[in-house]
Amino acid sequence: MHGFSNKQHDGFLGHSYICEWVNLGANTNNSNLKNNYGNVRFFLGDINVETNKKFIGVMMGDYSKSGISTMFNTGTYVGVGANIFGGGFQKKMIQSFKWGKDDLTDLDKFIETCKIIKSRRGQALHHSEISLLKYIYKNNK
């Protein structure tokens, strides 16, 4: 788990990779082992990555969030700025800036929220970061 990310409540995040400024809701859980004990695969867009590993949890990009009791399957990938919530297991590949299961985040509201998130920790959202987030949003597939 990288800096300024937040996991304050119950839940399991075994063998996961959590980037910066991620907020994980209470009881967010992931599986980290397939039921058939096979190697874990995960998806990056259209690319299917064979890891040759038995244990991999969720990988979450910067500024992503999960709601209360969110469940991630083994080898789930969550892009930048996604706000994940809703019952049942989530999709294994969640694109950047996803809102819930089917919608996209409003970019202007997202940037304002990022400013609030960082200001709570005495940090500022710099113009270079805003430019990068806009680039990722524009090129999101």
Predicted regions and their residues:
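Glycine-rich hexapeptide-repeat left-handed beta-helix
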Residues: 1-141
